[in-house]
Swiss-Prot record:
A lipid is attached at residues 219-220 (S-geranylgeranyl cysteine). It comes from the Eukaryota. This is Ras-related protein Rab11D. It comes from Nicotiana tabacum (Common tobacco). Keywords: Cell membrane, GTP-binding, Lipoprotein, Membrane, Nucleotide-binding, Prenylation. GO terms for molecular function: GTP binding; GTPase activity. Its main location: membrane. Pfam families: Ras (PF00071). Belongs to the small GTPase superfamily. Rab family. SUPFAM superfamilies: P-loop containing nucleoside triphosphate hydrolases. It is a lipid-anchor. NCBIfam families: small_GTP (TIGR00231).
Length: 222
């Protein structure tokens, strides 16, 4: 699977919008910088304004551009709007493993996400900052149980140490890819049977029904 850092010339087969949500200071901007540019800065200032970055990857021999959106500080004013969620087919729901309150707010973020996004959006719960294990305030099992109850993927990560971030994004992007691919195949079948194919020529932003938590991803490593 190609990393695709900084490759702007290649043909793009799919574009998937993925949003990062969660309380302030849980590391969303660092997660974005690490995944999109393989960069990390401890001096990263709070994000202000709309921000998204892209990274292109190869998934099953197709070129997929991930368009990753950061809430850009709006969460501090509880001002994340429906426009932010519009068109998103994936979401990273982030909390800080050293701050219990950020995990306790996850149900509210999930409720807001499901109210504004497509009901079948692919969601990954992320417990960030595993590099601060000695300050852990959220047991892995608590998050794991919540993810299983809500039908979410789940991993613990460290943007600082680049732990599990590739796995987290690739799990979500591959799941979206598989859903869209199935819809395209179904559309082709309908067309061959003389029925109109609503997805003909459209390869982006169409999630499908539900997602299953693979056993290998429904756990964490720190």
């Amino acid at each position: 699977m190609a990393s695709g850092y900084g490759d702007a010339s290649q043909k793009i087969d799919y574009v998937f919008k993925v949003v990062l949500i969660g309380d302030s200071a849980v590391g969303k901007s660092q997660i974005l910088a690490r995944f999109a540019r393989n960069e990390f800065s401890l001096d990263s200032k709070a994000t202000i304004g709309v921000e998204f970055q892209t990274r292109t990857l190869a998934i099953q021999h197709k070129s997929v551009k991930a368009q990753i959106w950061d809430t850009a500080g709006q969460e501090r004013y509880r001002a994340v709007t429906s426009a932010y969620y519009r068109g998103a087919v994936g979401a990273m729901l982030v909390y800080d493993i050293t701050k219990r309150q950020t995990f306790d707010h996850i149900p509210r973020w999930l409720e807001e996400l499901r109210a504004h996004a497509d009901r079948n959006i692919v969601i990954m719960l992320i417990g960030n900052k595993t590099d601060l294990e000695d300050q852990r305030a959220v047991p892995t099992e608590d998050a794991k149980e919540f993810a299983q109850k809500e039908g979410l993927f789940f991993l613990e990560t460290s943007a600082m140490e680049a732990t599990n971030l590739e796995d987290a994004f690739l799990t979500v992007l591959t799941e979206i890819f598989n859903i869209v691919n199935k819809k395209n195949l179904a559309a082709d079948d309908n067309q061959s049977n003389g029925n109109p194919a609503s997805l003909t020529g459209k390869k982006i932003l169409v999630p499908g029904p539900g997602q299953v938590i693979p056993e290998k991803k429904a756990c964490c490593s720190s």
